[in-house]
Design a protein with these regions (language model features):
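An alpha-helical, amphipathic repeat domain used for nucleic-acid recognition
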Residues: 1-156
């Protein structure tokens, strides 16, 4: 199968960044020169667009997965999206997102309906969970205060 056919099949399943497409075509054993030609053609025809991929991924990560800006940025960088493209996509997507509400939803899901934090250990676990989800320490602290958490996870 040609690299072009493989690329079309890969892109028919889901949006891929340029790096992801190159990696997958390389994994399938296509020569570098053929991959370069195919990727160039895909870029010219707008079949491959890192900005579109970044916006779509950021919308899904924020809206469905309840992830914060910092984690989404890390994930976009891992996908091979250029930092400036990722920053622009995040600014566009997170302009419409209330980060406090996003933290509250992630916290509510993690607490499984419990109204209050019951211990210092639970507070620390929730704090670390929200950090891993890409939220800022200030936003996390404010959200934890609303569910009975202490002001600082380092207070013992």
């Amino acid at each position: 199968m040609s690299a072009y056919t493989d690329a079309l099949q890969l892109l028919a399943r889901r949006e891929l960044s340029e790096k992801q497409l190159r990696d997958r075509l390389t994994d399938r054993g296509h020569p570098a020169a053929e991959i370069a030609r195919v990727v160039e053609h895909m870029l010219e025809t707008k079949s491959l667009d890192d900005a579109r991929v970044a916006r779509a991924y950021a919308r899904t990560a924020a809206g469905v997965k309840k992830r914060g800006r910092l984690r989404v940025m890390r994930e976009l960088n891992a996908m091979g999206i250029a930092r400036d493209v990722a920053t622009e996509a995040l600014a566009e997507v997170f302009a419409d997102v209330d980060e406090r509400a996003l933290i509250a939803k992630a916290l509510q899901k993690k607490m499984r309906g419990r109204p209050r934090i019951s211990s210092a250990a639970e507070h620390a676990r929730l704090y670390q969970f929200l950090i891993r989800q890409g939220f800022t320490p200030a936003g996390i602290a404010a959200a934890l205060r609303t569910v009975g958490g202490r002001r600082d996870p380092d207070e013992e």
